[in-house]
Design a protein with these regions (language model features):
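A contiguous loop/helix-start segment that scaffolds small-molecule binding in enzyme catalytic cores
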Residues: 4, 8-12, 82-87, 137-139, ...
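Short hydrophobic/aromatic-enriched beta-strand-loop microsegments
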Residues: 56-62, 112-116, 132-138, 184-193
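Class I S-adenosyl-L-methionine
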Residues: 3-22, 27-118, 213, 223
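Hydrophobic packing residues within well-ordered alpha-helices of enzyme cores
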Residues: 49-50, 108, 127-128, 176, ...
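Short gly/pro/ser/thr-enriched loop/turn and capping motifs at secondary-structure boundaries
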Residues: 46-48, 65-67, 122-126, 149, ...
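A broad, low-specificity signal for short, low-complexity segments enriched in glycine/proline
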Residues: 1-4, 19-21, 48, 124-131, ...
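Class I SAM-dependent methyltransferase SAM-binding "motif I" and its flanking Rossmann-like core
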Residues: 94-161, 203-206
């Protein structure tokens, strides 16, 4: 049930922290972080972004194997919204792209708490590569490598997408690559992994899809994985891979 009127005080801002580089924050995100009395932040938020806020910082990130349950995050948001004029809920990338932002918005609205979404630069764009390119890739799709409860995604809808971006798929890269090959993607299709995009620790790894399927590629999370001909043109031919970094 909605909270009593008198219990409501604060507004919750669901803010995208971008892929890492603090200079990729929106002006609104920067302003809110500078003024926020409390910031509830996720695991993948860059420490340089957190350093911008003088307010209280509450970690609510989800580590593999152990995590704050989403319900507990909801309770914390309600508690802080009651206690402060406003609250920043800070998520890596964009809060509405694989960030469970929609769940938090619905929960807060159901409980009578006003919410505003402040978009961030999604990590889908953090490679600096074009996901679409005239005459080469007329569309793209993004898929999570891990579903709720640790399930595996159905990759059939993505078999023929010109550019495919995989998030949270590093630990399952061999399975994903094998499944995409089984579904008909080109074994020699170029792919690019970008570890810790837009940060000083960024690392890029180029590999054919079949090489990934054979377990020949060493990558550490968090990493973005891009598959498609845009990788061949922009990362192999026309520009050095390192020249395409986004921020840093």
């Amino acid at each position: 049930p909605p909270l009593p009127e008198e219990a409501m005080r604060g507004k919750v801002y669901l803010v995208g922290a971008g892929p890492g580089d603090p200079e990729l924050l929106t002006l609104k995100a920067y302003s809110l972080l500078k003024e926020a009395p409390v910031v509830l932040y996720d695991r993948l938020v860059d420490e340089r972004v957190l350093a911008l806020t003088p307010g209280e910082k509450v970690y609510v990130g989800k580590e593999e194997g152990e995590s704050e349950k989403q319900e507990e995050i909801h309770r914390l948001l309600l508690r802080h919204a009651r206690a402060h004029p406003f609250v920043v809920r800070l998520k890596g990338g964009d809060p509405m792209v694989f960030g469970r932002g929609g769940e938090e918005v619905l929960f807060l609205l159901r409980h009578g708490v006003p919410v505003e979404v402040v978009p961030g630069v999604t990590s889908l764009l953090a490679s600096g590569l074009p996901l679409t390119h005239r005459g080469l890739a007329h569309g793209f799709a993004a898929v999570s490598g891990v579903l709720e409860g640790g399930g595996y995604p159905d990759l059939r809808p993505f078999a023929r997408v010109p550019t495919l971006v995989v998030l949270m798929g590093v630990g399952r890269r061999v399975w994903i690559a094998k499944e995409l090959l089984r579904l008909g993607r080109n074994p020699r299709e170029p792919t690019l992994f970008v570890e810790r995009a837009s940060t000083p620790k960024e690392r890029r790894v180029l590999a054919a899809l079949e090489e990934v399927a054979e377990g020949k590629v060493e990558v550490r999370p968090p990493a973005l994985w891009i598959l498609g001909e845009v990788v061949r043109v922009f990362a192999e031919k026309e520009a050095p891979v390192d020249a395409l970094a986004l921020g840093g």
